[in-house]
Amino acid sequence: MVQIDLAKDSVREANEKIRELGAKGEDIDVINPDARHHIGVGLTEAVTVRVRGSAGYFCAGLTDKANFDIEANVGWGVGDNMYTGSVVVRGNAGAIPGVAIRGAEIVIHGNMGSRAGQVMKEGTLCCVGNANFMAGYMMYGGRIIILGDSGERVGEDMSAGEIFVAGDVASLGSDAKQTDLGSEEDQDIREFLDKYKINFSGSLKKIVNAGTKLRYAKSEEQVRSIPFFTFSGNSEYWNPKIQEDIHIKSQIGRYRVRGYGGARPLPHLGVGRAVGRAQ
């Protein structure tokens, strides 16, 4: 195992070394992390990285296949957009742990902050302690296991995936409901806990999307061949895809805001108002 000292190297230099060592199949020990941000970001090799202390924001973000073991605490966004691989946090985690993971396994032995598993798509986020508010916020898939209490508004605006809670469910989020837990699901969770040597003998409650707020009054047609007015100027932004998108949104009266699936109504673009402005 090769040692990297963050008391001597910057995070940028350390991450370059981590990726180079990973390409050679070397496991890595990171000492004196001092809660520095972005440790291990971008690693895509099946090696083990041990962080001997606390890590800061977005540790193990944008990684694939690697396994991280963090001895103490971690800041916001641990495992951000992690594809496969794993992260084990021996202490607590800050807000949005497991944000947008796509298959990774993240285990937090302490408590975790708000909006855990936000927009996650696949994989498992497990918290041995308690969660803060809105765990599973807008999650699209995967599962969250909380062996402590859920925190308020668990499952807020989730569209898919499952949340399992052993402790108290403080309150359900918008469009979330509690449902029955199948025996196969229960067994699969216990096998996962055994894999990470987590002792658990209690029972679990299952939370899923209720399916009451996933429909708009007017559906957006999935059609590619849509006429639109062309733009004669010289602009890289005003391309055919943008024009098509604006045409679709003008028909349904709703335009998506980039980031986390938000939407807002289009303003009224009446002819009279346009003429008035021209005058």
Put a short name on every predicted segment.
Residues 27, 36, 46-48, 56, ...:
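Detector for repetitive beta-architecture
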Residues 67-69, 100, 119, 195-197, ...:
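Hydrophobic transmembrane alpha-helix bundles
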Residues 50-51, 70:
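Structural recognition of beta-strand segments within beta-rich domains
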Residues 1-39, 90, 109, 124, ...:
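Intrinsically disordered, low-complexity terminal regions
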